[in-house]
Amino acid sequence: MNNFIVFEGICCSGKTTTCNLLSKKINEIGEYKAIYNHGAMTYTDLGKKFKENLGKKDMPITVSYFFTDLIINTKNIIKPYLTDKHIIVLQDRYFDAITTYIKAYGDYIKTDYNIYDIPKALVKNDILINPSLNVFCIPPFKIIKERMAKSKESPVHDFYRDNPDFFKIVYNELVNKANESKENIIIDTSSDLSVEQGINKILEAIKK
């Protein structure tokens, strides 16, 4: 069963809203229970510190915080949930969101920050989990920029607003990652039709 569904996307891409819509649909059907779990930058003390440091500290420190936070969350939260075959975990960010961010930052400063091999190795060694399904929330960049301009103050959002060229590079890197596999579901969250079609595809995948 496809019970570990990961939603990836840049800030203000509509991940959380889409997760909530899907969660409601799953719970209405009644066969499974949907559990929402926030991935990168979790609600733990370490996750909160990671969020504060993102965009402020250099990338080696950022990467260390990220993988430590994600490994702990996988061990203590995700894996226990997945032992129950009646639970579907809707993961709001896993590893693609941050690895694309790091890679994009390297491109921005013209340095090789490609760390895509790290999560692959962690999945291979059963430390992280390979998602049953990857869902990328990617509305047009213009829409995300408009949403970001109205969004709350935070270290991550402020860094994007202060560095619009970097913001676009991150967006493009996520688009590239989304298009790597035909199995990925891409949702334009600015379109009600695209959201509806994407959710229906996910519901079909859950049944397999």
Question: Predicted segment positions?
Answer:
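NTP-dependent small-molecule kinase module
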Residues: 23-25, 142-208
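Walker A/P-loop
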Residues: 16
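A glycine- and Lys/Arg-enriched "phosphate-lid" helix/loop adjacent to the NTP-binding pocket
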Residues: 98-173
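Hydrophobic anchor at the beta1->P-loop junction of P-loop NTPases
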Residues: 7
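ATP-dependent small-molecule kinase phosphotransfer cores
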Residues: 37-117
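ATP-binding Walker
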Residues: 12-13
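Post-Walker A helix-loop "phosphate-sensing" segment adjacent to the P-loop in P-loop NTPases
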Residues: 24-34
